[in-house]
Structures are given as C-alpha cells and as structure tokens.
Regions:
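Hydrophobic alpha-helical segments, chiefly the membrane-spanning helices
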Residues: 1-336
Length: 336
C-alpha cells in the first residue's frame, strides 16, 4: 500500500511538470500562429489534455480485461465520468485557486461568445447522448444516427471556433506568451519546430503521468474493493482530468481566464461528442441508476455555468457551487 501512495505522489509531480511544459509551449504556438485564446484553449489545449481520459475507454473497449462486461463498464464509466468531473470538481478547483485574490464576489471572465458556444454545444450533445440511452439495442439505425449527429456537432463546433478566431484576435483576445519557452533556456531557438517538440514532450509526459496515476488509483481501489463501474465513474476521472485541472489553475492564476476556462469547456465538448458516439455504438449504453445520476448532475452543472455566462463574467461563488454537484453525486452513489 505504501508503494502505491509513493507511485501516486511521483506521478502527480510528473503531471505538474508536464502541464507547465505543455501550457508554455501552447502559449508560444498560439502566439506564433496568431490565433485566439479560444482556439488555443478550447481546441488545442482541450484535445491535448484529453488524451489520458480518451485512452481509458478506448483501451478498455479494445479488451482491457478478459471480461467483456467489465470492459464495457469501464468504457461507459470513463466516457461519462470525465464530463462530470470537468463540469463540477474541476470548475470548483479553478475558482478556488483565485478566491483569495479575487474574493467570492469576484469574477472569472472568459471571452463570452466562445464560452457560450462551448456550453451550448456541450448541452446539445450531452442531451443527445442521454436520449440514446433509452433507444433499444436492436434499433441500431437510430443509435447510429445519434452517434453521427454527435460527430457532426463536433465538426461544426471546430469550424465555428476557427471562424471566430480572426475577429477575436483583432479585438485583443489573441494568444500571448508571457514567458520565454522552456527549451530556449537550454540553448534551443524559439521556432515552430522547437515549439512542436516541446508540445510533444509535454503531451508525452501528461499521458505517461496520467497512465501511471491511473495505475496507482486502480491499485488502491482494488485494495478497497471498489467496483469497475464506480472506479471508472468516480476514481479514474480524478486522475485522467488532472492535466485539465492543473493547466486551468496555472492559467487562471496568470489572469488568462479564456485559456483556463476554454481548456475545461473545450474538453467537455470533445468528451461530450466524440466519446459518447463511440459508447453508443460499442457499449450497452443503458440508463443504469448510477450512470443516469451522473448524467443528470453533469447536465445541471453545465446548465448552471451557461445561465451564469454574463457579460461581466462568471461569479466565483457560482462556480464554487458546482463543487456541490460532485459532492452530491458521491453521496448519492456511495449510499447505494
């Protein structure tokens, strides 16, 4: 047991270092490409940091264990647990990171049009994914149509986000790199090749650290006797969402609210469209009580964020309230 906790601590350090390497390179990439913070956060950062939680269900469905039922439980739990974590606990932690400097009545001010686009897309997509749970397994044509609609939503979202980039850059929302690139400190020039190299190093460390953390968490959960579905819904996302949590905390502390929130909401869109599409087609995708409870809380938390998307920003006290959603889910699920 002691070794497991040492492994968890070491992998957490790896993830923290990786997040610094990744965010630093991404800021330089966004600045060099002259793209908005919305594109950098909601697309590039979101997809990059979503790699660990994307791998978990894919590897599970490809045959992570010898039991197909267990593989499907892990797959469904990981797919639905990630957006739950982002909409509740991750948002709460980001707000908590600046409550001392901004106060509970302070605000976090991401660029509003991009934030609203992210939340509207996620709410539409996750609602479709929820509807798919009630479609009988034998009605594969309807399930396939819903899965295709989810993929189409993400494609449309990417197109709209890129289209808005030029206007946002002109309006002062371009990505800026406040610090020198880390690789430049060891004598390498700051150019596109070294930026991409540092990005790849950051992603590799993020994925490796998250996988190691997942391994440690799984070991602890087995010792405690936690089920596969509960493990993938509650415990694994704590590890796989660490890159988003750490990146967003780093950016929010630097005053980069659009990047910080875009990293979360962009990951929610990615994980609320493409991954559920896979789940609909490759798993039972049924409205089991613990699954449906998580989906309802996720939609409620996302709707709460959307309702609070005001011109002057989102109140920190309102974001702290999202943490109650995660606490409520734990209480309801563990009480069963």
């Amino acid at each position: 047991m002691t070794f497991m906790f040492v492994e968890l601590a070491f992998m957490l350090i790896v993830i923290l270092v990786a997040a610094e390497v990744f965010t630093n390179a991404l800021e330089h990439l966004g600045e060099r490409l002259k793209i908005s913070e919305g594109v950098t956060g909601s697309l590039f950062a979101a997809v990059g940091t979503a790699l660990p939680e994307t791998m978990v269900p894919l590897l599970a469905l490809a045959g992570g264990t010898s039991s197909q039922a267990v593989n499907e439980e892990i797959g469904v739990g990981a797919i639905l647990g990630a957006p739950l974590m982002l909409a509740t606990l991750t948002t709460f932690l980001m707000a908590l990171a600046v409550i001392r400097s901004r106060g509970p009545r302070g605000t976090i001010t991401p660029e509003r049009t991009g934030f609203v686009r992210d939340m509207n897309t996620f709410l539409a997509a996750f609602s479709l994914a929820t509807v798919a749970m009630f479609v009988p397994h034998h009605n594969w044509a309807v399930r396939a149509l819903l899965a295709a609609m989810l993929v189409g939503l993400y494609v449309m979202y990417v197109v709209l986000t890129f289209r808005a980039s030029t206007r946002l850059v002109d309006a002062g929302h371009g990505t800026e790199a406040p610090h020198a690139m880390l690789l430049s400190r060891v004598g390498l020039p700051t150019n596109l090749a070294t930026i991409v190299l540092q990005l790849l190093i950051g992603v590799a460390l993020l994925v490796g650290g998250a996988k190691g953390f997942i391994h440690g968490v799984e070991g602890v959960s087995h010792v405690l006797g936690v089920s596969a579905l509960l493990l993938s819904l509650i415990i694994v996302p704590i590890a796989t969402e660490l890159p988003e949590k750490v990146n967003s905390v780093l950016w929010i502390r630097r005053g980069k609210d659009t990047l910080a929130f875009g990293n979360i909401t962009g990951a929610m869109v990615f994980q609320g469209t493409l991954l559920p599409a896979i789940g609909i087609m490759l798993t039972p995708w049924e409205p089991r009580p613990e699954v449906l409870t998580g989906v309802i809380i996720t939609l409620a938390a996302a709707a709460w964020l959307r309702v609070n998307a005001r011109t002057r920003g989102l109140a920190i006290w309102a974001l702290l309230a999202n943490g109650a959603g995660y606490a409520g889910y734990l209480a309801v699920t563990l009480a069963r």
